């Protein structure tokens, strides 16, 4: 019984201290699945707090499974990878969400486009949570992307684990 009570108290303290975004000096790391039309893969991102409601960061993705084109050609490494610089507005406290939750719209400047994303984080403990993000290109660097240029240059959905560093 003592072990059960001790474990319950430790978990309660961990859940009570969980916080999705703390502000300046906060560092988050996300690791998840990248899902889009024509392929799926892995995505990582990291965000660094600048102020109470602002952060900047970096994101990268690599498509592990990507569809062949009409001629049977497979995308090369350069077609499968993407990297972006991002800026977020962390609005969890603005919307008076629980401290374990954060919603963050943002802008991306990447290898293939200028885009936007909307994300949500929920932390179960001080160091571990889940996240989900949806992103869209606003302006592609190629006026009419065709073939493999469409990979990483379209609506994308990410879901995975979030870590407080």
Locate predicted features.
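Transmembrane beta-strands of outer-membrane beta-barrel pores
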Residues: 31-37, 60-66, 89-93, 109-113, ...
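Membrane-embedded beta-strand positions of outer-membrane beta-barrel proteins
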Residues: 27-31, 58-60, 85-87, 105-107, ...
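Solvent-exposed loop/turn segments connecting transmembrane beta-strands
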Residues: 30-42, 106-117, 144-154
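Short loop/turn motifs that connect adjacent beta-strands in outer-membrane beta-barrel proteins
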Residues: 19-24, 52-53, 92-103, 124-128
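N-terminal, post-signal-peptide region of Sec/Tat-exported proteins
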Residues: 44-82
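Cleavable N-terminal export/targeting peptides
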Residues: 1-24, 165
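Predominantly the C-terminal beta-signal and adjacent terminal strand-loop region
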Residues: 59, 63-71, 121-165
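Short glycine/proline- and aromatic-enriched beta-strand/turn motifs that initiate or cap beta-hairpins
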Residues: 17-56, 87, 156-158, 162-164
């Amino acid at each position: 019984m003592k072990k059960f009570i001790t474990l319950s108290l430790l978990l309660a303290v961990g859940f009570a201290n969980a916080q999705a975004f703390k502000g300046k000096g906060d560092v988050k790391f996300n690791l998840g699945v990248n899902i889009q039309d024509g392929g799926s893969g892995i995505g990582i991102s990291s965000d660094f707090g600048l102020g109470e409601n602002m952060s900047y960061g970096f994101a990268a993705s690599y498509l592990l499974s990507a569809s062949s084109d009409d001629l049977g050609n497979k995308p090369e490494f350069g077609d499968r990878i993407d990297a972006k610089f991002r800026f977020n507005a962390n609005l969890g406290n603005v919307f008076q969400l629980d401290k374990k939750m954060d919603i963050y719209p943002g802008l991306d400047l990447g290898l293939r486009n200028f885009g936007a994303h909307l994300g949500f984080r929920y932390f179960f403990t001080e160091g571990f949570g889940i996240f989900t993000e949806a992103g869209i290109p606003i302006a592609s660097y190629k006026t009419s992307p065709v073939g493999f240029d469409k990979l990483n240059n379209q609506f994308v959905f990410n879901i995975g684990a979030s870590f407080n560093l």
